[in-house]
Curated annotation (Swiss-Prot):
Its EC number is 2.7.7.6. This is DNA-directed RNA polymerase subunit omega. It catalyses: RNA(n) + a ribonucleoside 5'-triphosphate = RNA(n+1) + diphosphate. It comes from Streptococcus thermophilus (strain ATCC BAA-250 / LMG 18311). SMART domains: RNA_pol_Rpb6 (SM01409). Promotes RNA polymerase assembly. Latches the N- and C-terminal regions of the beta' subunit thereby facilitating its interaction with the beta and alpha subunits. The lineage of its organism: Bacteria, Bacillati, Bacillota, Bacilli, Lactobacillales. The RNAP catalytic core consists of 2 alpha, 1 beta, 1 beta' and 1 omega subunit. When a sigma factor is associated with the core the holoenzyme is formed, which can initiate transcription. Transmembrane segments: none annotated. One of its GO terms (biological process) is DNA-templated transcription. The keyword Cell inner membrane does not apply. Pfam families: RNA_pol_Rpb6. GO terms for molecular function: DNA binding; DNA-directed RNA polymerase activity.
Amino acid sequence: MMLKPSIDKLLDKVPSRYSLVILQAKRAHELAAGAEPTQEFSSVKYTLQALEEIESGNVIIHPNPEAKRKLARLKVIQARLAAEEEERKIKEQIAKEKEEGDKI
């Protein structure tokens, strides 16, 4: 039985079989969790869809995983700060409206 995509083509995209398996598993989990696909698929299974994306070059191993982790943490912090700022503005607006209501 011939695998599609070919293991040889896939190994050209990653440094080792281990890396291929890890990348495929992570991407399959992302797809199963509702991540946006990068292309149209001929397969219905998430594991095969992940392999199709790897073969096409749409999914790669990040060259600097630590930088990727730092960027992800930074995005979380920025989102939290934005939410706190929004909450602060809402509280100020409520206090202002309450103060204006007390004047009437």
